[in-house]
Structure formats: C-alpha cells, structure tokens
Amino acid sequence: MKYGLCAVDLDGTLLGPTGAAHEADVVALKKLLARGVPVTIVTGRLYSGTRHVAEQLGLRGPVACVDGSHIVSTETHKTLHCHALAGERAIALRDAMAASRAATFVFAQDQVVYDERGTAYLGYVSTWSTSLVATGDSVSHPYWEEDAGVTAVVAVGDRTQIHAAVEAIAKTLGDHAQVAMFPAKNVDERWGMIVRAAGGDKGTALAYVADHYGVPMSEVVAIGDWINDLPMLRVAGRSFAMGHAPEPVRKVVTDRLDHTSLEGGGVARAVELAFGVRAK
C-alpha cells in the first residue's frame, strides 16, 4: 500500500515530557515532506500552542487543533473550520460553569482566558497553549456571547464541583456537547473536565485534511498515544500507537510501537514502516 498523508499527534507522540520534539522524529517528518508526502498535526492543543511545532517541521497546509474542533491553515494562520459552542449553547455552558465554581478556562479566539481561581493551575493548562489571558471573572468574559462562540472549556476543581458541572451540562446541553471528566494530571486531588461541541473529533478533522489533499482515508497514516486519538486511529488506513499508549488505544491500531515519548523515535519508526523513509 502506498500512503499519501501522515498525521501525527503532539503531546505524548511527537513531543516528549518537556514539550520538545525529538530530533529523529523531526528529521523523519522533514524527509517525508521533502518526498512530497503531506504531513499534518492533529492535536488537543490550541493553534497558538501548535504553531511553533508546525513551523519547526516546515508544514504548509491545514492542521487540526483542540481535538479536531479547530482547523487552521499554517500558511495564512486563518481558521478553515471551527466547531464551536455558540449562542444559547455557549450561555448554557457558561451558566453551568458559574454554578460549579470550578476554575474555568475559556478556549476562544486561539487564547485561554482564566481568572484568579485558575492561577494555581496555569502550569497544567499551559499544555494546551501558552497564550494565556487573565480576566476578572472567566465566566463573565465577553467571549461567551460573541458570534464565534467558545471552542472548548477546561475546568479544574474537586470531584464534587466537576461532577456537578458535568450533570448540569448533560441536563441543559444534552447531545450538543461532548464532555470528558478525568483526574487532573500533576494536580493533587483535583479533577479536570473538557467540554467541546459534539460532532467534531480528531477523526472528522483528519477526514477534512485528507479531503483537502485528495487522499482517501485508506491511504492515511495516523500516529497517536492517548484516548483522544482513538477517532483518528480508527479511521486511518494505517495507525500506530506509541509504546506507552493504554490498552484501549493499542487495541484499535494496526501497529504497536515500542518507543515512548520519553526517549522518542516512535514517529520516525512509524514513518519508516509506513513510507520507507529512514531518519538516518
């Protein structure tokens, strides 16, 4: 099989724990580009947290951010597609977050808006973007009422606060929102939550990018490591899971890598196996 597009996740896949890409993986992707094979990024990060990696690789084309909710051109830095919560749905989400009193981070217009309650968690949230904007009260920021809506909302709080928010969102937004609740990494005894508009994920975003390049999904290669990568790993013709990926991810892929993001080299190995391009 000849493959025509390579899609790579960032954190935990191309990027290591420090947020930097490993040299061998960068070299492999650049060699792939030099052969005329398009490469794209499909990440949970905002574009502001993705752009420097795209520039490091020399990407020219669409990249998918916020788990597929925001697709941006790396050439113009303009939005190609945005799947946001707007209007009454954004207001309903805002009200649910206000009632929960959890630290609320609003992802909108390629920024993360936070208030005093979120200051302690900036290190955690900066994984998505370092374009952080302080405000007096994040749940009363004008972004909630703008036509563009909000791309996503992340919240951090105790389990009771987050559970209350999840229940309120389910009651008021129902199938219009997708919600994930989880123990917050590196934040002791705190829970996290991310909310996005339903209907968009890494799989739909990858289909958009593949269509942009005129590549059938059967000829797309995807590389990821985490649960949010499942939608793109399921739809790609060939899919790779990093060595540290949890079993639900490893179950759905065509290939399981031994490499982890700690030592790097997983992306380079996937590129070699799928495209015959070696980093060295």
Where are these regions (language model features)?
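Mg2+-dependent phosphoryl-transfer enzymes with acidic/Ser/Thr/Gly-rich catalytic loops
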Residues: 1-5, 22, 195-280
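Hydrophobic packing residues within well-ordered alpha-helices of enzyme cores
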Residues: 25, 50-54, 165, 169, ...
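Short active-site oxyanion
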Residues: 36-40, 60-61, 151-152, 218-219, ...
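Conserved acidic, metal-coordinating active-site core of Asp-based
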Residues: 107-223, 229
